[in-house]
Amino acid sequence: MYGLWKPRVLGAWKVPATGPVIFAVNHSHNIDGPMVMGVAPRPTHFLIKQEAFIGPLDPFLTGIGQLKVDRTTADRTAIGRALGVLEQGGVLGIFPEGTRGDGDFASLRAGLAYFAVRGGAPIVPVAVLGSADRPGRLVKALPPLRSRVDVVFGDPFEAGDGSGRRTRKALDEATERIQKRLTAHLENARRLTGRWATLE
């Protein structure tokens, strides 16, 4: 990543050095996941749509510990592998919006809350800013080479309410709490990086 773009990493020291952790990452460009994997202080295993595992990318992504998920169904194999990452004290990366969008955490799925509550892992919000600002000159599908991309790690927090409940209502409530925390982190990240202007 450092050879292609100019990542500026803020708050990496906030990531717990050991134990299970979930990175909740906003998602507006295809390079967001690789960017976080490249700059994170700990190895990260992302849940990635199965459509990305094509050709030579399949053995490559699998070899570096990324997790294939079928988004059209409750993929029990992917769920089990993701929980396994947390059980082994690893870092699980999730795009809580479920797919690429505006990257503003406006619509979250319940999966993040499920993994956080079931896996007993704190959530670290991660904002990737600048990846979708403008297309590159040589490759339109990528940000301009050597352009700055900011990756801002936030304070870890617990998704549950302390009751240990895993009911649908409890997960819905946890999702609401998570969304507020992620949105607040994104706003703070924009202030820290001076990227408010990109919204105007």
What are these language model-derived features?
Residues 2-3, 10, 15-74, 81:
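Catalytic core of membrane glycerolipid acyltransferases/transacylases, capturing the structured
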Residues 3-5, 40, 119, 186:
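A broad structural signal for alpha-helix termini and local helix breaks/kinks
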Residues 7, 16, 20, 34, ...:
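Proline-rich intrinsically disordered, low-complexity coils
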Residues 7-9, 151:
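Generic structural signal for residues in well-ordered beta-strands
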Residues 1-6, 197-199:
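N-terminal membrane-anchoring alpha-helices
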Residues 1-2, 60-61, 143-144, 150:
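Short, conserved catalytic or adaptor-binding loops enriched in Gly and charged residues
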Residues 77-200:
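Non-catalytic C-terminal accessory region of glycerolipid acyltransferases
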